[in-house]
Structures are given as C-alpha cells and as structure tokens.
Amino acid sequence: MQRLRFSSFTWILLSLFGLISCRPEPPIEPVEPAEVAPLTDAEQVIADALDGMVVPISSTPFDITDTDLQVLDYLADTKIVGLGEATHGTREFFQMKHRVFQYLVEQHGFDAFLFEMDFAEAMLFDRWIQGEIEGDLRSMMRDEMLFWTWKTDAVEDLYTWMRDYNRANPDKRIHLYGVDTQSPNYSLKELLRRLELIMPTTADSVRFYIGSDYERMLDLYNSKDQIAADRIQNSLEEVRKVIEEAKNAIIRSSSEEAYAWIERLVTHMEQVEAHSYQYFVLGQGPLRDKYMADNTRWLSDQMPEGSQVALWAHNYHVSNTFTGNLFNDSQGGYLRQRYQDDYQIIGFGMNTGRFTAFNRGTLKTNTIPTVANRSSYNYLFSHMQNKNFILRFDQVTSSDADAWLRRAKPFLSLGAVYQAPASNYYYPIILTSMYDVLIYFDNTGSTLLIR
C-alpha cells in the first residue's frame, strides 16, 4: 500500500495545527477534582430541576443501555444527526459517538457515518469496512490517516464494528464518508485510481495537466507563491475540462454513478485549492465549514431516498452557528439553514479530566483538574447529582432551568491544541441555540493513540 508523502514544511505545518500522529501515555485513573465553591441557592434550584429531567448514564459509554438511549428515539426519522466533541482528544466522547451511532443503526436504520476527515481519505477506509480490501486496520490507520485525532483505539473499534455489522447484514450495509477539505493528496490519488480502472488514457491526461504543484500546494501557498497558485488554478481548470469531455465515455465504460463520484473528486480538489488559497495566500478566514456542509449535502443526496446519516465532527463544526458571515458560519449552521429540523445536533461537554492535545509543540495528555470558569455552564453541571447524563433541551420543563440554558454563558471548547490555563478555552455561547441535545461526562480520560 502506497503511503502518502508530505514535504518537511507540510509536516511542520500540520504539527502546528495538531495533525501529526504520535502516542501519549495511556489513559490512567480519573482526575481527582479540586475543591470548588458550592452553588448559590438560585443555582441549586436549577441544578435540582435539571437533575430531574436528564437521563443518567454510565461513565463508560459501552455500558450505556438501549433503554438509556431511548431518549434519542425522536431522531428516528431525522435525515442528519450531528455528533460533536468538546475536545479532539477525549476517549469518552469518541466511544459515546460510537455507541450512539450503533444505536441509530440498529434501532432506526441509519445508513452512514460522515467524518471530519478528508473526502477521499475516507474512501480507503470505507473499502475496508465494505470488505473490498483486506489488511490490518491498525496499520492502515497508522500509515494512511492524516490526522492524529482519529488514529485512536476508539475509532479503530468503530470501524471494526462497522465492518462486522456489514458482514452480518449484507443487505443493509453501512458506509463511512469524509467531508473535510484540508489535504491535496488524497483526492488526486483516488481520482487517478478510479480513472485507471475504466479510462487509463483520461488518467494520463489528468497527470499531464496537474503536474507536481498540486500535491505541493501547502508549501507553495504558505510562501505566498502567486505564480504557483496561478499554475495550480489553471491546471485544475484543465482537469475539469478533461473529465467533462470524457463524461459520456466514462458513463459508457462504467455508470452514471461512477462519473458522479469522479466529477466530485475534481470538485473536492477545487475545494482544497480554494480553501488553501483563501487561508494561506490571502490570509482570510477558512472556507472549510462551507465546503464540509456542501460535501455533507452532496453525499446525502447520493444515497437512496430516505437514507439517514450521522456526522462526526468537533462541537463547533456540528453546531448551529450561522450569521451570514462566510468565515464565521459553521458546517452545522449551513446544514440547519438547509434542512431545518431534519438536522439535529448533539453537543458534548465535560468538567474535569484528561485529554490529548498538542501543548507547546508536543502531543501529550493534558489535564484539567477543576472547572476554571465560575459562571460557565460546566460549573453548574459539575454540581449536579447526576454526573454523566443526556439532556434533551426540548424536554426541559422548568422555567428557571430553561431560562438559564437560554442565557449566554461560557462553555469549555478545545480543539487539537492546548496550553494552560483552561480558562482560556471557555467561550460564551447559548447552549440551546447551538445544540438540541447535550451529552455530558463529568470526568474524562484521554484518547489512546495508535503508534
């Protein structure tokens, strides 16, 4: 299996964004929270009310029963369910997303898991899930995955479960798809692989026009090389012409569906270029979320009518954040605008514990020993009797609790990079505006990365 190759600068760049794989020490016992001040009387009333409305769950996601998850049965007919994560390195979040997806598949017939991973990168792993290729999954993840965030035992367990499910249910197969647009490497390789199978001469034409600049894009764009950018943009225009001119021949040699996927790979290459140019050359906000939403829509449309999918991404990406500003709107915001209530959002929260993230350039297990923000949602949740729970906001019947949830408050949110103090990572949001459901674990452990 050919490994993806990145230049030295690209590896440095990916490291800064927390994307290189290595392995922290294994998760250890839960963090012992430091003593914190009690709630006020008014806050205690809210905490008590919420305790009566949440579904208590185990701190171990795979011990959570189907009965516990019946609170999510209202999602039975939902087209897309977003599953967030408050950090990119929390084991309970990853395992819980597996558990929820398993429930949605087994109880409600969901068809696919869309991932915050490269569009074409996911195709390789879906072929493994479908049984089309063999090989050791752990080795594939170590060698072929770009982001360290997904190179975990929890994701390995999820993909293994999906493959096992397909073996047991060949007439109701589930799929893995990617929606992200950060790497120039995967889509070109996948485009050429597909063309080689049905139209080798068209593959040769793509190679002729694309040259070597496209795969070196991140290096060239980081150096603000406008001449190279012009070459890359022109080459992509030529590649699109080649594919469109070969459309009828591709369909005759294969199918309309095959052409649709080939054309979409070209679209994805264009997305990666536009996002990279906007971000690195122009220094403007990223276009990722807009494109991730568009890829989610396209993938959903490609599936049979009535298909349902879950979406794995960070809390921010799945959230309903839509202002009309291209650079501030989230993937979930675009999806809510398009699908309205047919897109439902499950956010994740935590109080204390360990998580994996880059800290001063080193990928390591980090610790939050106590809630840092007295006015945060997390602070009150940490004082509830039920330490781990599922809360549907549409089932909040207490007026005091409802009003409290609808007021903007800080909420802990980490990505792939962390540097203490934790108070730097609390952002004011309105929980009920951004999410429909909250899954909360009071004390968490870090992900276990694959070497």
Please annotate each region the language model reported.
Residues 10-19:
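Bacterial N-terminal signal peptides
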Residues 2-10:
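Bacterial N-terminal signal peptides that target proteins for export
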Residues 22-451:
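Structured catalytic-domain cores with a bias toward divalent-metal coordination
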